[in-house]
């Protein structure tokens, strides 16, 4: 048969399209299998029921009860807690490594203290940052619900103490976080400390219209986050954290995404609420190191491949003594990243690699283990295993993104809070109201 130009073009097109058609058919078959499983287990099919919970109603009493309690607690910045071993200034964040250790039954009786014991690591700054990160989002959530100025004003008082007042504001860098006592070498593990500030950044975007902060104070807060964002993008230790293939790398990306959203638009950021006109001259300069477009590229090209297996596991979390807690921690942070980096024109939630690693696969894989902890197929965590799961925000955010009401229904049934600081530190998204609502424009 004589080869014509038409035959050649047709055969070439068929050869090029065949792999794509095969992948599309495979994906359709997987979707059909998933739907059949859902029907067999009595679950709602995607899109057949509402996956949008009324978070304001669900959390109303919880938020206001906590906010009322926090109104009586004054700001407690780092300078209120002197760190005797810190090589830095009173404004520098300082913490000492406090690695959780497996319980042991060897040696002296566990009921009696050892004859000599090492001093407890210094955690006062970590505790202060944790409390700050719990109180400010709660107060702002209460302001959203009630429009009562007292909540916004008390949140603003905390922000002034931590980010504005020179005498008490925290230095926007972490060279002394999670140090080994007696050393001064920075450690990448320290970057995890400020993942608590992610929800504080979310809360800040709801405050400008409250006028609880003056334009100059608001600009100073923006400058603080812009300066810290630059440090995250240039410091060697911070970049080592960025390149980790586990929750440390995810924490860096979540922080960068949250803080970049407070950056000026001409830096590639998407500040949710622009600084009021009188303070434009005080606004931070464009960040030349980190912007949201670069972070989207990192998520697509690095994070998915490095962290998620084809079946949805986080392989690098499974080798730790806390595979369950760290997997849920990582899942929640990835959900926050997808939420922060998505736009009206591009949903990061829907991005997936050709061999399937994706957020959609990860949440579907972990869903049954959140619903029934006892089915977890890997070793149980050596500590705090029975205190989980909590009301994981990944369920709510993924349920909304993928129209999966069963995720949201499970989220509603789980405990929303914990008082254990160890678990709190791996649960940085505590006020979902700040994530499902968009800050009002100026």
Task: Please state what every model-predicted region is.
Residues 1-3:
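Secretory targeting signals
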Residues 9-21, 25-27, 39-242, 250, ...:
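Extracellular glycan-targeting catalytic surfaces
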Residues 31-37:
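Long, intrinsically disordered low-complexity tandem-repeat segments
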Residues 258-268, 284-374:
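Long, repeat-rich segments with strong aromatic
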């Amino acid at each position: 048969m004589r080869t014509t130009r038409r035959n050649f073009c047709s055969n070439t097109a068929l050869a090029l399209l065949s792999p794509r058609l095969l992948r599309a058919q495979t994906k359709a078959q997987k979707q059909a299998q998933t739907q059949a499983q859902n029907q067999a287990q009595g679950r709602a099919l995607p899109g057949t029921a509402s996956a949008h919970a009324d978070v304001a109603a669900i959390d109303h009493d919880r938020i206001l009860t906590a906010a009322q309690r926090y109104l009586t607690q004054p700001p407690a910045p780092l300078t209120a807690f002197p760190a005797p071993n810190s090589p830095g200034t009173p404004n520098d964040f300082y913490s000492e490594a406090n690695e959780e250790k497996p319980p042991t039954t060897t040696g002296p009786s566990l009921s009696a203290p050892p004859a000599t014991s090492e001093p407890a690591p210094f955690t006062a700054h970590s505790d202060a940052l944790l409390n700050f990160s719990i109180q400010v989002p709660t107060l702002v959530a209460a302001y959203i619900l009630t429009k009562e100025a007292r909540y916004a004003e008390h949140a603003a008082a905390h922000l002034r103490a931590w980010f504005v007042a020179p005498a008490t504001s925290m230095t926007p860098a972490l060279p002394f976080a999670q140090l080994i006592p007696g050393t001064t070498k920075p450690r990448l593990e320290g970057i995890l400390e400020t993942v608590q500030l992610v929800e504080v950044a979310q809360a800040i975007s709801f405050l400008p219209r409250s006028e609880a902060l003056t334009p100059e104070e608001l600009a100073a807060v923006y400058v603080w986050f812009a300066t810290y964002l630059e440090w995250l993008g240039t410091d060697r230790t911070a970049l080592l954290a960025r390149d980790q293939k586990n929750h440390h790398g995810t924490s860096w990306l979540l922080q960068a995404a949250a803080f970049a959203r407070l950056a000026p638009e001409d830096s590639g950021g998407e500040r949710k609420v622009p600084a009021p006109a009188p303070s434009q001259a005080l606004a931070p300069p464009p960040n030349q190191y980190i912007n949201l477009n670069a972070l989207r590229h990192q998520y697509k090209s690095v994070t998915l491949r490095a962290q998620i297996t084809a079946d949805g596991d986080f392989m690098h979390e499974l080798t730790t003594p806390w595979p369950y807690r760290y997997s849920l921690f990582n899942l929640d942070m990835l959900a926050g990243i997808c939420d922060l980096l998505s736009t009206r024109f591009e949903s990061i939630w829907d991005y997936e690699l050709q061999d399937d690693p994706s957020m959609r696969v990860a949440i579907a894989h972990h869903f049954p283990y959140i619903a029934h902890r006892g089915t977890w197929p890997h070793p149980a965590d050596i500590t705090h295993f029975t205190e989980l799961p909590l009301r994981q925000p990944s369920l709510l955010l993924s349920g909304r993104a993928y129209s999966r009401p069963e995720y949201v229904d499970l989220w509603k049934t789980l405990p929303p809070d914990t008082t254990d600081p160890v678990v709190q530190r791996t649960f940085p998204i505590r006020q979902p109201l700040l994530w499902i609502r968009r800050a009002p424009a100026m």
